[in-house]
């Protein structure tokens, strides 16, 4: 029985990759990679995101300067159609992922009751 759960997880992983929303996000990511300006902006976004996660893990908040930098980056992303398309595709995909997470973790939530 325990092996079955891994088989189900692998089937679920393949099913997510087969979703039109996943394919759209993947295509959007490839378009970003092919565009130097969009790729550079994406890399900057990832770096800022990692820095924010590090701050959060240590209980720190971004400085006013960092907040201004984040706001400026957000505006650049919003003005870039490739990045906007990618993040919209990711948002559509995240609906499935959130639903799957809720379903998978329901038994653990039941244990806390």
From Swiss-Prot:
Source species, domain of life: Bacteria
Protein name, UniProt field: UPF0342 protein SZO_10960
InterPro entries xrefs: Com_YlbF, YheA/YmcA-like_dom_sf
Family of this protein: Belongs to the UPF0342 family.
UniProt source species: Streptococcus equi subsp. zooepidemicus (strain H70)
Gene3D superfamilies membership: YheA/YmcA-like (1.20.1500.10)
